[in-house]
Amino acid sequence: MKQKLLDELMRVSEEEQKYLDGQGDIEKQLYAKEKIGEIDRELLLKRGQLITVRPHSRFVDFPEHRHNYVEIMYVAQGSMTHCIEGKELVLHKGDVLMLNQQVVHSIKRADYQDIGINFIAL
């Protein structure tokens, strides 16, 4: 991955800054309509869109949840730790994880150097 793109991905987003400032939980309204247990594609994909790409939010644990879309995570730098149906899986730079719809999982807190890219697809 080109350093320029990696530098862009390492910028701390507005959402991530809130976590660094002490907001303990993920911003539910960004991901779910009701409870964080199901992440809703309608909040992440624009109407008519079949796929989107976004960086994984760092500095916060993502609690156990499922999606109504397919998620592909690419680890661009560092590592990401997922707990998938009770089993821990550590992904490292260059690894790709594909999760089908409704797979129950959680993601441990990623630090500054841990860069994951989420591909969200119907």
Task: Please place each PLM-identified region on the residue numbering.
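Generic protein-terminus/edge-of-domain signal
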Residues: 1-76
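N-terminal regulatory/effector-sensing and dimerization cores
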Residues: 49-122
